[in-house]
């Protein structure tokens, strides 16, 4: 009997679905700003950024398929049932009301409303009003899921991508400066690869891939593929197609960002940079189109995230707190957070991402190599414990200086700097994870087979 697999056309459809899930307007602000910071070192910056903003997210989706899991909670549950619940909650809150949803509102405001205000001195008030209207729409459609998100996805997203392509081509044909002539900022002068690797965390796509991988699997199943191995293969191949498109967009965005330094000073954030570039090359009309399309794209993303988070928490709590209640709670919290502003949200998210990404990357890696140790729980535990401990030091290091002083973190940070290789590159968790894996494998191989399978 022949195992059904996706056709090329179907793989392209799945790749398009995955691209729509991953790539929102917020993803554009990081590569453009990265290009401005990296300058002539744009190529190593591209490589580092693509690894964490494309490679790991694609493999995160594939990890759900390869392990035949029915979602993130099942995959993380290979460590323990409690860990599966904890990690699922943490990831959904991060890509939901803590950072990603509020960021959607502030990206829309920064690219759409803020440029028209000038130095009014009342930007906080306009942000408050804008975010109130934005989240009123988000809540309305989250409580009444219907064709609005499909309409935005089928019409607004293609318009946005076409507009973005026109903008990038215009910028490439008339660059403000050659990227090779742009001086990098201090952090990117001697080593652009490692800072860019960490910059890719900001997209949050690796943890989003873990959270939404099951959605892609369901799409493939609805296309008639039922064999688990075939599903895993189709997830990976479709993901690679998505990754190629995302990588192309990131490469162009980073290059245009670097070239824009010939026209503008280093911007406060990527939203400001994108608005400046659109205004320079396409005028006021270009800025307006950018603002409208990004706002609708961010609206769609926010509705999807509120819906996904509310459904997940409704399921995990057994309906004790209704979907409607979760949707209202997450929307209200996102509204409150959005009013700290885009730059603040990005800055506040860094320590949390430094804490979450290492165990997420470790989980994805273990999912891929798990067949070599039968997905023995002891190996997962042996890797996760040192990874979390080491990631905690990265979390401490990236906290604001005032928080470090208040919490008396100088001593533990200095300890980590002296004892963890690559700590200065924000990868101090890597060696502990490898050592933990080695210990776990030794433990696994020394145990009776029936114990390892337990």
Show which residues each predicted segment covers.
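Membrane-interface loop-to-helix entry segments
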Residues: 142-171, 349-361, 380-390
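Hydrophobic, membrane-embedded alpha-helices of multi-pass small-molecule transporters
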Residues: 13-23, 93, 170-177, 186-253, ...
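A generic transmembrane alpha-helix motif of multi-pass inner-membrane proteins
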Residues: 174, 185, 193, 376, ...
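TM-loop-TM module centered on a large, flexible mid-protein loop between adjacent transmembrane helices
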Residues: 71-77, 249-299, 351
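Selective recognition of specific alpha-helical transmembrane segments in multi-pass small-molecule
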Residues: 51, 55, 59-60, 159-171, ...
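Hydrophobic alpha-helical segments and their helix-loop junctions in multi-pass secondary transporters
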Residues: 97, 101, 161-188, 206-207, ...
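Hydrophobic, small-residue-rich membrane helices and short re-entrant helix-turn-helix hairpins
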Residues: 144-155, 193-196, 216-245, 263-275, ...
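Membrane-water interface regions at transmembrane-helix termini and the short interhelical loops
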Residues: 66-70, 74, 134-156, 222-225, ...
């Amino acid at each position: 009997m022949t195992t059904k697999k996706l056709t090329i056309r179907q793989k392209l459809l799945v790749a398009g679905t995955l691209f729509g899930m991953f790539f929102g307007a917020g993803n554009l602000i990081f590569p453009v700003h990265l290009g401005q910071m990296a300058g002539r070192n744009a190529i190593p910056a591209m490589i580092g950024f693509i690894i964490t903003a494309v490679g790991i997210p694609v493999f995160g989706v594939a990890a759900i398929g390869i392990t035949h899991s029915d979602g993130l909670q099942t995959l993380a549950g290979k460590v323990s049932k409690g860990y599966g619940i904890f990690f699922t909650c943490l990831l959904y809150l991060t890509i939901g009301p803590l950072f990603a949803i509020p960021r959607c509102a502030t990206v829309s405001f920064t690219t759409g409303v803020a440029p028209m205000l000038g130095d009014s001195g009342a930007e906080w008030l306009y942000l408050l009003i804008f975010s109130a209207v934005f989240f009123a729409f988000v809540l309305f459609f989250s409580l009444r899921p219907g064709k609005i998100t499909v309409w935005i996805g089928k019409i607004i997203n293609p318009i946005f991508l076409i507009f973005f392509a026109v903008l990038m081509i215009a910028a490439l044909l008339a660059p403000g400066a050659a990227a090779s002539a742009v001086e990098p900022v201090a952090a990117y002068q001697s080593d652009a690869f490692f800072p860019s690797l960490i910059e890719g965390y900001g997209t949050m796509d690796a943890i989003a891939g873990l959270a939404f991988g099951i959605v892609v699997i369901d799409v493939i199943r609805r296309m008639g593929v039922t064999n688990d191995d075939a599903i895993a293969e189709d997830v990976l191949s479709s993901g690679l197609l998505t990754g190629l498109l995302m990588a192309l967009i990131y490469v162009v965005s980073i290059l245009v960002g670097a070239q824009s330094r010939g026209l503008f000073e280093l911007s406060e954030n990527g939203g400001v940079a994108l608005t400046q570039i659109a205004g320079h090359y396409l005028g006021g009309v270009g800025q307006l189109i950018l603002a409208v399309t990004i706002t609708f794209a961010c609206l769609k993303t926010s509705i999807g995230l509120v819906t996904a988070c509310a459904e997940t928490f409704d399921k995990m709590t057994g309906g004790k707190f209704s979907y409607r209640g979760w949707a209202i709670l997450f929307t209200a919290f996102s509204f409150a957070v959005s009013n700290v502003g885009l730059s603040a949200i990005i800055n506040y998210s860094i320590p949390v991402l430094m804490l979450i990404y290492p165990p997420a990357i470790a989980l994805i890696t273990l999912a891929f190599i798990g067949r070599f140790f039968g997905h023995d729980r002891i190996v997962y535990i042996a890797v996760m414990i040192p990874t979390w401990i080491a990631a905690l030091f990265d979390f401490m290091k990236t906290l604001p200086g005032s928080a470090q002083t208040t919490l008396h973190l100088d001593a533990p940070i200095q300890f980590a700097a002296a004892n963890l290789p690559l700590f200065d590159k924000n990868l101090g968790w890597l060696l502990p994870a490898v050592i933990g894996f080695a210990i776990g494998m030794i433990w696994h191989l020394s145990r009776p087979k029936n114990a390892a399978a337990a």
